[in-house]
């Protein structure tokens, strides 16, 4: 893994790819082929499988991302533990541009004031799907696979 100007906590596992200007807190984990760009924070034990792209994204503790995901300009919270956590299925993409190609504000899947307490229902975003931002999604939301 090529790492430039990142902050790493203890027991962080970065298995391959590129990370720049990002923060990985204790126990964060990214699989091979990761592309983690500036402004990204993986909080404690947040993780992604192989070939995950992140930019200006905050994953609260325990959040799990599947493989082949592009998840930029997002905050994802929810869940209470390693066994009860928010999850994004494989092959998910978050689109965050206007029809004119201009960047919009970030999407919120959960929120910080409640998510930081680790006492909210997890959010599940099914694989082979996507979202067109900006969106605000509440705790406990379940989106089936293949949905946009």
Regions found by a protein language model. Give the residues of each.
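C-terminal, active-site-flanking charged/polar segments
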Residues: 142-148
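Flexible, glycine/small-residue-enriched loop-and-beta-strand segment within the central core
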Residues: 1-135, 147
